[in-house]
Amino acid sequence: MRMSRLFAPTLREIPAEAEVISHQLLLRAGFIRRSSAGVYHYLPLGQRVLQRIMAIVREEMNAAGGQELLMPIIQPAEIWLQSGRWHVYGDELFRLKDRHQRDFCLSPTHEESITDLVKNNVSSYRDLPMLLYHITNKYRDERRPRFGLMRGREFIMKDLYSFDRDEAGLHESYMKMYQAYVNIFRRCGLTFRPVEADPGAIGGTGGSHEFMVLAESGEAEIVYCDACDYAANTEKAECKPQVTPGLPPLPVEQVATPDQKTIEEVCNFLKVAPADTIKTMVFRADDDLVMALIRGDREINEVKLKNLLGCLDLRMATEEECREVSPGGAGFLGPVGIEEIPIYADPEVMAMTRAVAGANAPGAHLIHVCPGRDFTVIATADLRLVQAGEPCPQCGAPLKKARGIEVGQVFKLGTKYSKALNCTFLDEKGQENLMVMGCYGVGVSRTMAAAIEQNHDDNGIVWPMAIAPFQVLVVPVSNKDAAQMEAAEAIYKELIAKGVDTLLDDRPERAGVKFKDADLIGIPVRITVGNKLASDGVVEVKLRRGGEQFTASREDVVAQVQALIREQMEATPVS
């Protein structure tokens, strides 16, 4: 490809709407252009990166026994109603009607579609296990699309679905996919961590892991242990319990706390530590109100609470709903005297003996509250977010936190969808059984953005070799120098003949402009054909990553660059 013919409109200024570095650089370097909020055109450079990522994904899926197909983007409402997700999915589901007023949706995911397909075409144990995948556009009506390709309304994903006879078969398929994902992200040149995760809206009762590309700009937070292999996202993370016996109980007392509504205000007013207070919260779980208690220095984990309750929808109660429970409203909520709604508490709360809690009266709190004596709970369970420094649940070493970008997730669905859509097979005895399912997603377009978040510098993108739009850029310093142009053309053609993806910058631009664009676009290897060609018979080779430079003879440069490419392709980042 010649740069004079390449459609890659670059920008010198950072677009105002671009908040994160990947969005800024993808726009500036001419990889994407905005069509509408959360929807993008992929220009030739961007498409080349996507194709490279998809090629790696396809190779690993095929090697693991996957078969590629393509499912429709428009899905009928009937199968979503059968699974129960038509109403549960909420406003993020793009819904539409055809001219006959029949309901459809634009697919955010394909569990229903693939289950319906397999149900109607696979019936025998002899056909299992079966692994089917596709790579296609997905749609999600994000309230506020942001961060470019990180959170858009249209995005590209690979989904593989496994169908097995039993849980043992599912586990085997799951581990195959887990290893395939490790291979994919290593081959893409990314530093990542697989972490334990909550299955979320996709559901299922089995395990789930997210694959997180480590980056300071990541939306997600992960908890991990350096001393062992434990890692989880914050929704799933646990720590080793640290409950210590409290002081001997004292009689509960009510004290005036006028206008002191927050934990910080109450602690300052009563001269107590946040760890000595009970944080009381009321939630609406589907149609019911519930109360959740954690220690005052902790943060509630709504995912853990939702899983404990088994509800479909969970949200914080409004002030009006809080006043249905307590005349004091949200600022003076407490568990003592509450009988109308169920109370759930974190184990740390139940170990307290002289706690401060709201008195359920305006301007008042209780001191010396003793759980079990002054109030009872329906259940005790881990309800809080883990903090850095707490002991690892596996080995006890201090936990650490890092930020990451989710680029893939694997799920053990079990029989959630096969049961809802009656996807069964006949076993060796002729008995009907539900297929046991797993699903495995890779965010292809998100992986492109995540790679930039992890691989950039002040000058632009620093693509890993395996997913770069081109492997080599050949730059003649002066288009007016016939010898330079002839040598650059010859090197370009020789590299192409050797199977190296090469871009020739044949534009009549100043050398400084060419070099600036080269750094912005981020092609891993740059060959500069300049004045040293005439004087010494050599060209300059520069690596985008690290900036290492060396000279090579015109005759040897192609072989040396090929060796460099092999070396970078084989390099494995530390996960």
Curated annotation (Swiss-Prot):
Name recorded for this polypeptide: Proline--tRNA ligase
Assembly and interaction partners: Homodimer.
UniProt gene name: proS
Keyword Cell cycle: no
GO molecular function, one term: catalytic activity, acting on a protein
One GO BP annotation of this record: prolyl-tRNA aminoacylation
Superkingdom of source: Bacteria
The organism of origin for this protein: Heliobacterium modesticaldum (strain ATCC 51547 / Ice1)
Keyword tags: Aminoacyl-tRNA synthetase, ATP-binding, Cytoplasm, Ligase, Nucleotide-binding, Protein biosynthesis
Record EC number: 6.1.1.15
The reaction(s) this protein catalyses: tRNA(Pro) + L-proline + ATP = L-prolyl-tRNA(Pro) + AMP + diphosphate
Note on domains (UniProt): Consists of three domains: the N-terminal catalytic domain, the editing domain and the C-terminal anticodon-binding domain.
Cellular component terms per the entry's GO annotation: cytosol
Similarity remark: Belongs to the class-II aminoacyl-tRNA synthetase family. ProS type 1 subfamily.
Subcellular location: Cytoplasm
Pfam families named in the record: HGTP_anticodon (PF03129), tRNA-synt_2b (PF00587), tRNA_edit (PF04073)
Function of the molecule: Catalyzes the attachment of proline to tRNA(Pro) in a two-step reaction: proline is first activated by ATP to form Pro-AMP and then transferred to the acceptor end of tRNA(Pro). As ProRS can inadvertently accommodate and process non-cognate amino acids such as alanine and cysteine, to avoid such errors it has two additional distinct editing activities against alanine. One activity is designated as 'pretransfer' editing and involves the tRNA(Pro)-independent hydrolysis of activated Ala-AMP.
